[in-house]
Amino acid sequence: RRRRQPVTFPILGTSVTDYATALGIEDWTGATGVNISGTCDLAPISEQEDMLTELFPDAKTVGILYCSAESNSKYQAELFEKELEADGIEYKEYTAADSNEIQSVTQSAAEECDVIYVPTDNTMAANTQIINNICLPAKVPVIAGEQGICSGCGVATLSISYYDIGYRAGEMAYEILAEGADITAMEIESAPEVTKMYNAQICEELALPFRMTMSHRDRIGWRSSQKWQNKNDGRKER
């Protein structure tokens, strides 16, 4: 059997929450230093925590619900916990190893917490109906890490646009293939803006005062490289 040669051609990722964790990079500088780059789907954790405390100032305990098998979810949870600690808010972690455990874990969270936070998490995103079927009758609101989860079980989110980060990854590919950009020096880029969204139906059922339809969006600028902002002023036609 022939030994596989190391892959050296450029690899671009998108919707990766934390490249350092995914690639096992300890000394993170923004660029991987290898043949991998791309765009990141990490939402602004600090602003999400600010949203939670603003909407639910009387919350005593926040539950953080995620799948323990997803390293990116754990990374987000740890960042969110640091924000809660800085604000002196108690929190409890509720982790499910897989979809089979979501119902029991969510039930515990709904019984013990005032608000639940669900980060960007593939397992939770695929099971929002289970979460909603428990949290809605229990009158426990969910702050979501992204739009899809918010649509299924959340009351509000600050979400990135997956279209935008996918588009940017395509632009990065063009820069490499057509312009000769060095992928080892290309920094991982984040979404150029984030969107504040409310789930009108769930807010109404919970009798929350900040009802807003998902089609009405309050777009809030977020971190991005100036290079990306300039490109998106007038997207190129290929």
Residue ranges of model-derived segments:
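Short, well-structured alpha-helical segments in soluble
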Residues: 1, 103-114
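Short beta-strand elements of ligand-binding domains
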Residues: 9-22, 38-40, 141-147
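Short beta-strand elements in bilobed, periplasmic/extracellular small-molecule ligand-binding domains
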Residues: 34-36, 81-99
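An alpha-beta-alpha
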Residues: 37-85, 182, 187-203
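Hinge/cleft segment of the Venus flytrap/periplasmic-binding protein
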Residues: 175-236
